[in-house]
Amino acid sequence: MSNESLTIIDNRTGKQYEVPISDGTIRTMDLRKIKVSDDDFGLMGYDPAFTNTASCKSRITLIDGDKGILRYRGYPIEQLAEHSNYLEVAYLILNGELPNEEQLKDWTWHITHHTFVHENIKKFVDGFHYDAHPMGMLIGTVGALSTFYPDAKNIFDAESRKKQIYRLTAKVATIAAYAYRHRMGLPYVYPDNDLSFTGNFLNMMFKTTELKYQPNPILERALEVLFILHADHEQNCSTNAMRGIGSSHVDPYSALAGAAAALYG
């Protein structure tokens, strides 16, 4: 009998079962072998709201709220918040390691070249009521992006998936800024890719009559840190919604719209 196992005695039958333990967990499918009779379906786990159920194995994010721990790919959040920018952290989450200089340059180039949205997206946002909630506008508009990029349905092609990552990382910020400007009754502002990712977001949000928006460096850095802190939150409701919807092989825009709806709750 292995030390890394759980011994279960079924008092209904008197039978004894050994269930392997791996990383502090057991597979609920291993409970299926616990039966009263051969035609019995087997024991199942019941866990309302999945409060004690892990849906997958992950090496991306570790959160321990009681101890104040947040790590992305093993890097402590304090280190990333002090020394990295948002696009570096996004690359880290996707690829497992921080980018070198050339990788960051290539990654940043691809993101900044996808910040613009189709002009018809403006008309779509214009259709919302003047006081519509920004999250409602974001959900609807991100979902609508799937109709602009039918190639996104080709989810089994690695290059196609990579292109959707570029698009979503870049365009969601533009859409969020448009939602804010719509509520404020202000004209939309085109992206300025000479600025940083967060500097450009501030530009699209707050530019007024100046020819060239120059973000306040303190505010720009504060927003950078805020984006880093919210880059990933482990297996929360919206993450599980994204994974569940994505498992049906739908395009990532539709899946992200559903995940945003879960976050909206």
Regions from the language model: what does each represent?
Residues S2-G265:
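Hydrophobic alpha-helical bundle cores within soluble ligand-binding/oligomerization subdomains
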